[in-house]
């Protein structure tokens, strides 16, 4: 499933802020954990202090995309399997709010398309991990 995303700078080697959105239509249930699989060829340094989870206002033609409030969460990066695991202190509810994982990164040297996959563990009597969708981020040549 194709998910929405937004970035501030598409140029290669540029400082970038990438918003990976979790809209209400993307979440059927509340989410206990979020896993983001980073593509192998996305060569950029990720640090836990540069990743956060927040309630977000998705911008458009006349509004800016920005975080409204940060959601406290434990963030772990597994550099071998190239996965980011996010454990919010309280589960993300399945309400009408939009949430986003925000990466503050330097773009990789190679331009092209990078596909990030996300998995979520649903909150309920029996937590079930399931595939939520993918974001295809484009890095430009210029």
Regions found by a protein language model. Give the residues of each.
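Soluble periplasmic/extracytoplasmic beta-strand elements of cell-envelope proteins
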Residues: 33-37, 85-87
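Helix-rich interaction surfaces within compact, conserved domain-sized segments
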Residues: 30, 105-142
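Extracytoplasmic
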Residues: 15, 29-33, 48, 81, ...
């Amino acid at each position: 499933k194709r998910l929405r995303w937004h970035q501030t700078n598409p140029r290669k080697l540029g400082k970038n802020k990438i918003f990976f959105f979790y809209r209400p239509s993307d979440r059927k249930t509340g989410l206990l954990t979020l896993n983001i699989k980073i593509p192998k060829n996305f060569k950029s340094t990720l640090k836990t202090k540069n990743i956060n989870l927040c309630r977000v206002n998705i911008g458009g033609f006349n509004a800016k995309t920005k975080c409204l409030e940060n959601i406290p969460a434990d963030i772990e990066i597994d550099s071998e399997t190239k996965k980011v695991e996010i454990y919010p202190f309280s589960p993300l509810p399945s309400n009408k709010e939009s949430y986003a994982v925000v990466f503050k990164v330097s773009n990789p040297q190679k331009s092209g398309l990078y596909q990030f996959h996300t998995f979520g563990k649903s909150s309920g009597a029996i937590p079930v991990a399931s595939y939520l969708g993918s974001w295809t981020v484009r890095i430009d040549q210029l």
